[in-house]
Every structure is written in C-alpha cells, then in structure tokens.
From Swiss-Prot:
Alphabetical list of Pfam families matching this protein: Hepatitis_core
Gene3D superfamilies according to UniProt: Viral capsid, core domain supefamily, Hepatitis B virus
Lineage: Viruses, Riboviria, Pararnavirae, Artverviricota, Revtraviricetes
PTMs per UniProt: Phosphorylated by host SRPK1, SRPK2, and maybe protein kinase C or GAPDH. Phosphorylation is critical for pregenomic RNA packaging. Protein kinase C phosphorylation is stimulated by HBx protein and may play a role in transport of the viral genome to the nucleus at the late step during the viral replication cycle.
The species this protein was found in: Hepatitis B virus genotype G (isolate IG29227/2000) (HBV-G)
Name of the protein in question: Capsid protein
RNA binding: region residues: 189-195
Subunit structure: Homodimerizes, then multimerizes. Interacts with cytosol exposed regions of viral L glycoprotein present in the reticulum-to-Golgi compartment. Interacts with human FLNB. Phosphorylated form interacts with host importin alpha; this interaction depends on the exposure of the NLS, which itself depends upon genome maturation and/or phosphorylation of the capsid protein. Interacts with host NUP153.
Motif annotated as Bipartite nuclear localization signal, chain positions: 170-187
UniProt record similarity statement: Belongs to the orthohepadnavirus core antigen family.
Major subcellular location class: virion
Biased composition (Basic residues): 161-188
Length: 195
C-alpha cells in the first residue's frame, strides 16, 4: 500500500471523503496544491462565515459536520506535531515529520476545508460544476483552451441562468405570431400550459 494514500485507504477500506457529496479525491486533485489557501486562512474564513453554526449543537448540514471534523482533525494533528517537535531528539527526523505533515496532511486538510467552505458559500452543485470545468480546462491542450482557468466566484451567475431552463415567455406575442393566429386556432390557457 502506498503511504501517501494511507489515510483514504486505511485498513483496506476504499474511503473517499468527498464521495457522499458527489465529488472524488481525483476530481479535487486536478486543482494544483498552490490553489488552496493556507489552513490558517481557511480556518479564519470558516470562523468568520460559519462560526455560529459550527459551534452550535444543532445539525445544520453534512457540510457543517464534515467541516467540524476536518477542523478537529487538524487540531489533533497540530497537537501531535507539537508533541513530536518537543519529544523527538533528532532534528533531521523532526524535520521529516513536520515536512510530511505540512506537505501531505496539510494539503488534504486544505482540500477538505476548501471544499466544504465553498459548498456552504456557493452551493454544492456550483462547486461540482467548477471542479468538472477546471478538470476539463486543465486537461485540454493549451492551444485549444481559453488562457484563464474557470473562476469559482463567477460560476453562480452563469449557473443560475442556465439552471432556470428556458427564458420566461414574453407576455406579448411577436408580430409574426399575431398575424398567423386565427380566432378558431387560439386555445384557452389550460393549467398545464401555464407551467
């Protein structure tokens, strides 16, 4: 078993922390590691936006629960890192542990925090659409893709318009339609046609 996949493949279980939310570890892996803000920035954002609901004893949403768990895991990991730093005599070994935690576990926590904060902020469907859009963009050869990657904060505007379906019907028919309709062909509006 590869050591870098151990947290999600622990004890032979195929556990993907994003699966129940419609995403996968692979889908998030399209985003480069420097895309994700620092853990400190993400924790500050979560606290500023969702402190009350995160501290509440009420169940708000699965994203709140997952966010609580990620924050608690990071706290425990920092406690362990502090203990290792204070108790491991060999500086080279200490540096290896700290670097491993920051590089591997830090990235996984940053991904989890970003995903759940983004889902709470923008909506799960928008975040999933963004991940797919970015995945398509990054895999498209540079010569055939737009120069700039999709931006999550701009997706809700386009997503909302597209999700509403067709644009509302105009109240007045076009002149062409008005001329072509004869009195005997006009129908009274039925409840089904008003949807």
């Amino acid at each position: 078993m590869d050591r870098t996949t151990l947290p999600y493949g622990l004890f032979g279980l195929d556990i993907d922390p994003y699966k129940e939310f419609g995403a996968t570890v692979e889908l998030l892996s399209f985003l480069p590691s420097d895309f994700f803000p620092s853990v400190r920035d993400l924790l500050d954002t979560a606290s500023a936006l969702y402190r009350e609901s995160l501290e509440s004893s009420d169940h708000c949403s699965p994203h709140h629960t997952a966010l609580r768990q990620a924050i608690l895991c990071w706290g425990e990991l920092m406690t362990l890192a502090t203990w290792v730093g204070n108790n491991l005599e060999d500086p080279a070994s200490r540096d290896l542990v700290v670097n491993y935690v920051n590089t591997n576990m830090g990235l996984k926590i940053r991904q989890l925090l970003w995903f759940h904060i983004s889902c709470l902020t923008f909506g799960r469907e928008t975040v999933l659409e963004y991940l797919v859009s970015f995945g398509v963009w990054i895999r498209t050869p540079p010569a055939y893709r737009p120069p700039n990657a999709p931006i999550l904060s701009t997706l809700p505007e386009t997503t909302v318009v597209r999700r509403r379906g067709r644009s509302p019907r105009r109240r007045t028919p076009s002149p062409r339609r008005r001329r072509s309709q004869s009195p005997r062909r006009r129908r009274s509006a039925s409840p089904a046609s008003q949807c």
